């Protein structure tokens, strides 16, 4: 697949700054998948609905370790057998803001925004719920090359709170979308699409210069 079809990391950051959703594609030798990625600070019910409808995977909210400790979001399991070491916490819903069942696009967007609100406390969240926080490794993609860390990095680089919203992108038949299909999705919805490797290299270059 020609790289001409992909965007630069800088273009992706500008898109996140505008409150848009981007596509971040994994390395072929890792999960080999693409995720819709957005900044949690500007998430809306419309964006959640888009991600659920066109992503079809599990909508998750990457957060920093510090934020998860503050909200007492413990890991879902004490010891994981997941080879990717995806750090799921217990799922949550927000108690306030007229949240009802917790599963609607509106309810999930309210829960996500509540989690990054500095005034929210641990007891403001019910457990279990319908939003799945993920604990990101400190140091971003240079520490762990996951979509979890990439989402945090993109949000931070765009000037938002270090928290994201991600969902895996599947094809209509339920199979995982790979790069050729992901490029088509990006074109269809006019979204920026980048390889995670580009972002990792961008971070390495930045660290060498600073």
Regions found by a protein language model. Give the residues of each.
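Catalytic domains of riboflavin
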Residues: 1-210
């Amino acid at each position: 697949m020609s790289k001409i079809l992909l965007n630069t990391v800088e273009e992706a950051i500008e898109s996140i700054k505008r409150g848009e959703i981007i596509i971040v594609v994994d390395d072929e030798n890792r999960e080999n998948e693409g995720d819709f990625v957005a900044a949690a600070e500007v998430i809306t019910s419309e964006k959640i609905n888009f991600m659920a409808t066109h992503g079809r995977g599990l909508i998750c909210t990457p957060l920093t370790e510090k934020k998860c400790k503050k909200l007492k979001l413990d890991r879902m399991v004490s010891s994981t057998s997941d080879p990717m070491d995806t750090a799921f916490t217990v799922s949550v819903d927000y108690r306030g803001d007229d949240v009802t069942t917790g599963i609607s696009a509106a309810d999930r967007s309210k829960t996500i925004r509540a989690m990054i609100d500095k005034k929210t406390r641990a007891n403001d969240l019910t457990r279990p719920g319908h939003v799945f926080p993920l604990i990101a490794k400190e140091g971003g993609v240079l520490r762990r090359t996951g979509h979890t860390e990439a989402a945090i990095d993109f949000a931070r680089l765009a000037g938002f709170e270090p928290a994201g919203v991600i969902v895996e992108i599947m094809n209509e038949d339920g199979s995982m979308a790979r790069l050729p299909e992901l490029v088509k999705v990006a074109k269809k919805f006019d979204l920026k699409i980048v390889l995670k490797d580009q972002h990792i290299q961008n971070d390495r270059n930045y660290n060498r210069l600073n």
